[in-house]
Amino acid sequence: FRSRDIMLNDAGIRLAELTGEGMKDIDFDLVISSPLIRAKQTAELVMAGRHLPMITDRRIIELSFGDWEGECVRDSKVLPPDFIDKFYNDPYHCMRAPGGESFQDVLKRTEDFYQSLVQNKAYENATIFISTHGAAGRCLLANFYDDKEDIWRGGIPKNCSVCIVEVKDGVGTVLEKDKIFYDEAE
């Protein structure tokens, strides 16, 4: 959740290290991260030893839960049942948390981020690693599909899952979705 800007725990650190090992043969030119500590830390661990420039961008920060920040959606006794149901099953129509954002808000700001990358000639042939969060990442990925309402696209992504996308002539294609570089049984 956004306002709880927490560091990765030991398990998160391990997943980021394993993901970095799995991606070691990919030549990246740039890292763009959400400004939240856990996203920056993930990027640093995945890209360890590469000495790449990192830019932070608030447009890929996680969905704000506003007054409900810090509540675990799955286990909450505070969140309205309709909110929980829509969050998992129809996030596009999920109500905005009081003082927070809707998924549609996040779709708009991640679309702006996506368009800024696509339209920037400096990134035309660049391989960019983007470190973001579950909801923000899925909203960013929606730019590659016609149907923007199917946000989760089969489920909430696992920690450190990777989507590989390609943009040619302004058209984005998802090459791989939710690839993981670790054994889930660990």
Could you say what each language-model-derived stretch is?
Residues 18-84:
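Phosphate-coordination/substrate-recognition cap region in phosphate-metabolizing enzymes
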Residues 38, 136-137:
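Alpha-helix capping/helix-boundary segments
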Residues 63-77, 119-126, 142-186:
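Acidic, low-complexity terminal tails and accessory targeting/binding regions
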